[in-house]
Amino acid sequence: MRTGSNESAELMELLSAERQFSMYGPSHWAVIAVFVVGAGLLVWIGRRQTEAQARRLGRILAVLTAAIFGSVLIYSLFPPSIGRSVPLNLTDLATAAAVCAWWSQRHWAFALTYYWGLVLSTQALITPVLRGPDFPDYRFLGFWAIHVLVVWAAIYLTWGRRMRPRWRSYRFVVVVTLIWAAVTFTFNSIAGTDYGFLNTKLTTRSLLDIMGPWPVYLLTATTLVVIVWALMTWPWERIRRPAKQGPQPV
């Protein structure tokens, strides 16, 4: 009986290990496929909606995003831990901004979602920081639902509803991000945590691996993000100016 129990325990451990999420495994590719199809569908829908229809869809998706985000936050409290229960990761702020953007479609919320979602949240699709069970575990579902919905919000509002970032949007998001980084870095230093990976580099593979050791990667990443965000703003401003100026008198 003891031998059988040991064998059963070993089998359960093996099955559990096999169910762990694997980067670019079948479940990861499935998420990417759902993301691509959903993004295309949202753009198609967004371009054909009336204002009332867009408001209704936005509020439905805002409630969905908020419900999932709230569930994730509640889960992080059991048991409470200073290292994971405080919503200081940029993902937390991006999700809150996406909820506001879905619901209100206000420009400040759109700006945060556009820059944070399209550059930072998409990193979860490429190099997910997910250490845990694979589909259909609730941690897997919560992680991917949050990140996918944030990026979907940015895509829907930009290419579906045709909202556009401005240079003032760029400046606003840079300032907000720097304030978040300063507050979070200070909190990490006092509490011994690593929210935002500002005080210690990720242990899983990520783009930070090619940016040097700490604190070099912070400077490298900041410079790169600021440049990329500027490049994400410039084309829209180029398009907007001729339209605003209109035909010039001869």
Predicted regions and their residues:
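Membrane-interface helix-boundary motifs at transmembrane edges
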Residues: 46-58, 103-109, 160-170
